[in-house]
């Protein structure tokens, strides 16, 4: 009789982000993505939001000591192979998380969350400089959308030709790679991944589905999953783009506003 194969621990991925009570974005989206992509997801909660398909009705930041304690609890015992950051609403939180990332031997995917899908501010204006000077320099990959690029760099992207300029402005703050998400532009969904020397253009047809809540969180988490598996940044980003495109295609209505992408779309295939 053949002995049973012992269980193998999956790649370990940690999200440092806020909670979305509606389950579409934030740590809920992150953990669903991590499970769907075959990794073990862990979380450090930075804020609690009252949020649904119509927007954010309230947000409460957790104390820095609570964030630090959660992070140390996970990293010092279990360990991590990649970290993803999301909502960090204050300068103090940004600087604390940047310090923690700098002391962790794992790639970091930084999603510099500035506003929600509905336009609700999730980052204090006083924290912008800390994102620029403390958080972005410790990022393996930074994944801003066009609104966040403008918020952080002042560069406005009106068409695809502006994406290189946006990437250069983000890279000037120190991340190893910048993934500029051009999903808000007209035409195909075009993203640019670059480290300043090599470029990777990622294109997908624009999908006729308004239910896209959680897209940014999902993409950044999917990239982190790829990095935790040992993939290079370009390979991880390309796989993440494919996963998110499928999730948007399967996005479903929820409540009276914008529904979420379907994180489990590939599980039934």
From Swiss-Prot:
Reactions catalysed according to its record: 4-amino-5-hydroxymethyl-2-methylpyrimidine + ATP = 4-amino-2-methyl-5-(phosphooxymethyl)pyrimidine + ADP + H(+); 4-amino-2-methyl-5-(phosphooxymethyl)pyrimidine + ATP = 4-amino-2-methyl-5-(diphosphooxymethyl)pyrimidine + ADP
GO MF, one example: ATP binding
CDD domains documented for this protein: HMPP_kinase
Pfam families membership: Phos_pyr_kin
First-level EC class: transferase
GO cellular component: cytosol
Keyword Chloroplast appears in the UniProt entry: no
Annotated EC: 2.7.1.49, 2.7.4.7
GO BP annotations listed: thiamine biosynthetic process; thiamine diphosphate biosynthetic process
Keyword Nucleotide-binding appears in the UniProt entry: yes
Keywords from the UniProt entry: ATP-binding, Kinase, Nucleotide-binding, Thiamine biosynthesis, Transferase
Pathway: Cofactor biosynthesis; thiamine diphosphate biosynthesis; 4-amino-2-methyl-5-diphosphomethylpyrimidine from 5-amino-1-(5-phospho-D-ribosyl)imidazole: step 2/3; Cofactor biosynthesis; thiamine diphosphate biosynthesis; 4-amino-2-methyl-5-diphosphomethylpyrimidine from 5-amino-1-(5-phospho-D-ribosyl)imidazole: step 3/3
Binding site for 4-amino-5-hydroxymethyl-2-methylpyrimidine: 51
Family according to the record: Belongs to the ThiD family.
Protein task: Catalyzes the phosphorylation of hydroxymethylpyrimidine phosphate (HMP-P) to HMP-PP, and of HMP to HMP-P.
NCBIfam families listed in its UniProt record: HMP-P_kinase
Protein name in UniProt: Hydroxymethylpyrimidine/phosphomethylpyrimidine kinase
Protein species of origin: Streptomyces coelicolor (strain ATCC BAA-471 / A3(2) / M145)
The encoding gene: thiD
């Amino acid at each position: 009789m053949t002995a049973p194969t012992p269980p193998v621990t999956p790649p370990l991925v940690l999200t440092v982000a806020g909670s979305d009570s509606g389950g579409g974005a934030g740590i809920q989206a992150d953990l669903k993505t991590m499970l769907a992509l075959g990794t073990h997801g862990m979380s450090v909660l930075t804020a609690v939001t009252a949020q649904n398909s119509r927007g954010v009705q309230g947000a409460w930041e957790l104390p820095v000591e609570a964030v630090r304690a959660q992070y140390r609890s996970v990293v010092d015992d279990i360990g991590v192979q990649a970290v993803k950051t999301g909502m960090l609403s204050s300068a103090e939180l940004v600087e604390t998380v940047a310090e923690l990332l700098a002391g962790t031997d794992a790639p970091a995917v930084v999603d510099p969350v500035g506003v929600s899908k509905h336009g609700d501010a999730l980052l204090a204006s006083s924290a912008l400089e800390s994102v620029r000077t403390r958080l972005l320099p410790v990022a393996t990959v930074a994944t801003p959308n066009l609104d966040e690029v403008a918020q952080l760099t002042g560069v406005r992207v009106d068409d695809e030709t502006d994406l290189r300029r946006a990437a250069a402005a983000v890279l000037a703050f120190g991340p190893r790679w910048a993934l500029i998400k051009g999903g808000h532009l007209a035409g195909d969904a075009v993203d640019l991944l670059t480290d300043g020397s090599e470029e990777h253009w990622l294109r997908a047809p624009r999908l006729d589905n308004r239910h896209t809540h959680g897209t940014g969180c999902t993409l950044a988490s999917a990239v982190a999953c790829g990095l935790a598996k040992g993939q290079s940044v370009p390979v991880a980003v390309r796989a993440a783009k494919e996963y998110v495109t499928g999730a948007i295609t399967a996005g479903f209505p929820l409540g009276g506003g914008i529904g979420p992408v379907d994180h489990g779309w590939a599980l039934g295939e």
